[in-house]
Curated annotation (Swiss-Prot):
InterPro entries documented for this protein: DNA_methylase_N6_adenine_CS (IPR002052), MethylTrfase_TaqI-like_dom (IPR011639), N4_N6_ade-DNA_methylase (IPR050953), SAM-dependent_MTases_sf (IPR029063), TaqI_C (IPR025931)
One Pfam family from the record: Eco57I
Protein name, entry field: Type II methyltransferase M.BstVI
Protein origin, superkingdom: Bacteria
EC numbers: 2.1.1.72
Keyword DNA-binding: yes
Record has S-adenosyl-L-methionine as a keyword: yes
Family: Belongs to the N(4)/N(6)-methyltransferase family.
Organism: Geobacillus stearothermophilus
Gene it is expressed from: bstVIM
Length: 561
């Protein structure tokens, strides 16, 4: 369990200096300004890489105007502020700053005084809680910690939730860090951070998106999905966000996508973002985007292109959601047991009554694109009315559960409901087995839709769609198209290797045409397996159904590459 005094170590991912310099340049913390007149904050300074770069710029600002840095020491105490919770990181950052200041000729007492003014060991989320009376900063920069909620002590997360309105659903800790950082901006302040892009699209980020769009102005975004901006590898895709207070009067938002990080790419990015100078047309290392309007409310941020955004909006306005009454599709997730090693069994290897066993399909079973069943079953401890079975009626199952009682009772679901200690986390509905459905794995870099004619119960790593008013084969064909992948790509979090999350929250955003609107010819072609084997031919049919022009489907396919 992570406590208030140790969570930062679980989110410690340090930023490469080239990225630090890019962020400082984009926020405007540059040595051509009189930086002693500005306040800069790093809310989670880690090993001090942002603070080191900021101090160099502060000193250069003085030197280029003919000052010796220690001449103005009385003016420097409020220029820098760094917060760090973890003692080990705090001490490392302190040592780094000592070395920097020694290089500028400060005496030991001067160094100690400055550093004591500049850095604080504290929990940023509990620091300056009253933002109406808090010190305000002209620049807030850094790399907020990436820590999952479940790693935080219950009492501490309750404090955070009470204080930060953006903590929603299972929001990671960088979300309230961003909120508090924004709250501490001065009237003309600028935030420049590098963090996961998950909040821009997924469910848990919706309140932060609304908080930003209602109260601040997004200025620049640098999409770093395919680069390595940190000293250690991360699985979530990072991006740089530069956000200003509402007092900033320019509405244009500029964004950059790059697959490499080099000095030239960083310079090209700055030239475009700061001065609208586009890079050489021959350069394939960087793509640029301009938005005359930003997204409203809690809408997902789709930065890849204005054209993609316009196409998506037209599709959203023209076609109903997949679970709308006109479709009557249902999206569900498979069963979570809390102890798969106990609840998922091979009937040939255990002595359990067959009445409580349901055939189970897993992600591994559908990896080939069709079901190749492993023979596994899941134990169903529920009656048809949703209550738990009486174990005395199933003596062999009772003996089996008693053999594994310690594992079963150690699950959270059992601890919360001791009288129902042998239930699975999710209730099991046996009737699902016999319903035709489409199976979709959680993470994939392409649409992977496998039909189950009505023989299996899905495992919890699988989402499934009940076809409702649709012919299941026609629905599967449409879901395999680039148009449907475009919906997922637009809304879903991307992981390493261009992997998309095909979670229920994103699947539910898919738009479908009215099944009655399809012609007989379109239906026949979509039911032809040869069509599904040709992505290009399939996409041409589905584009026709969605009333997309040849240019529009090409824009979609280019974006997905």
């Amino acid at each position: 369990m992570v406590t208030q005094h140790s969570y930062r170590m679980h989110g410690a991912v340090y930023t490469k200096p080239i990225i630090v310099d890019l962020i400082l340049d984009l926020t405007g913390y540059t040595s051509d300004k009189n930086l002693e007149n500005f306040k800069l904050l790093d809310p989670s300074f880690g090993d001090g890489v942002f603070l080191e770069a900021a101090v160099h710029r502060l000193m250069d600002s003085l030197i280029r105007r003919g000052y010796r840095p220690n001449e103005l020491i009385d003016h420097l105490g409020n220029c820098i502020r760094g917060i760090e919770l973890r003692l080990e990181a705090y001490q490392a950052g302190r040592h780094r700053l000592q070395k920097v200041l020694e290089g500028y000729g400060f005496s030991k007492p001067e160094i100690n005084w400055l550093i004591n003014q500049w850095i604080i060991q504290a929990d940023f989320l509990l620091w300056q809680e009253d933002t109406t009376e808090a010190i305000k900063f002209d620049f807030v920069v850094g790399n907020p910690p990436y820590v999952r909620q479940e790693l935080i002590q219950d009492e501490l997360i309750k404090k955070y939730r009470k204080r930060y309105t953006t903590i929603y659903d299972r929001a990671d800790l960088y979300v309230p860090f961003i909120q508090h950082s924004l709250e501490l901006l001065s009237e003309q302040g600028t935030l420049g951070i590098i963090c996961s892009d998950r909040f821009t699209k997924n469910r848990y980020g919706k309140k932060l998106r609304k908080f930003i769009t209602d109260n601040y102005k997004v200025r620049y975004i640098v999409d770093l999905h395919k680069t390595s901006p940190f000293e250690n590898e991360v699985t979530a895709y990072p991006a740089i966000y530069v956000i200003k207070t509402k007092n900033y009067d320019k509405s244009v938002v500029r964004a950059v996508y790059t697959e490499v990080i080099t000095s030239k790419v960083c310079q090209d990015a700055k030239d475009f973002l700061l001065s609208n100078q586009k890079p050489d047309q021959s350069s394939k290392e960087m793509k640029t985007y301009v938005f005359s309007e930003w997204f409203a409310g809690d809408e997902p941020w789709i930065i890849q292109s204005q054209e993609c955004r316009e196409i998506l909006r037209r599709l959203e306005n023209r076609f109903p959601l997949i679970e709308d009454d006109v479709h009557s599709c249902k999206i569900r997730i498979g069963v979570a047991t809390g102890a798969d090693k106990v609840y998922i069994v091979d009937p040939q290897q255990v002595d359990i009554e067959p009445e409580v066993l349901l055939p189970l399909v897993t992600t591994a079973d559908i990896s080939s694109g069709r079901i190749i069943w492993s023979g596994k079953h899941v134990i169903n401890p529920f009656n048809s009315d949703g209550g738990l079975i009486n174990l005395d009626d199933f003596p062999r199952l009772k003996t089996y559960f008693q053999q594994h009682e310690e594992i079963i009772k150690n699950r959270n679901v059992a601890k919360k409901n001791p009288s129902q200690w042998f239930r699975t986390i999710d209730r099991i509905y046996p009737e699902i087995v016999h319903q035709p459905k489409l199976l979709i794995p959680d993470m994939k870099n392409t649409n992977h839709i496998v039909k189950d004619d009505g023989a299996f119960y899905p495992h919890h790593n699988l989402y499934y769609i009940l076809p409702g008013n649709w012919n299941i084969d026609i629905l599967r064909a449409i879901l395999l198209s680039s148009v449907v992948k475009f919906f997922i790509w637009s809304y879903a979090t991307k992981m390493r290797g261009d992997t998309l999350r095909y979670q229920a929250q994103y699947l539910r955003k898919i738009r479908l045409p009215d099944p009655k609107s399809l012609t007989n010819d379109q239906k026949e072609r979509l039911m032809d397996e040869r069509v599904i084997q040709s992505q290009e031919y399939l996409d041409s049919i589905v584009a026709e159904i969605y009333q997309l022009s040849k240019t529009e489907i090409e824009i979609i396919k280019d974006a997905l590459e």
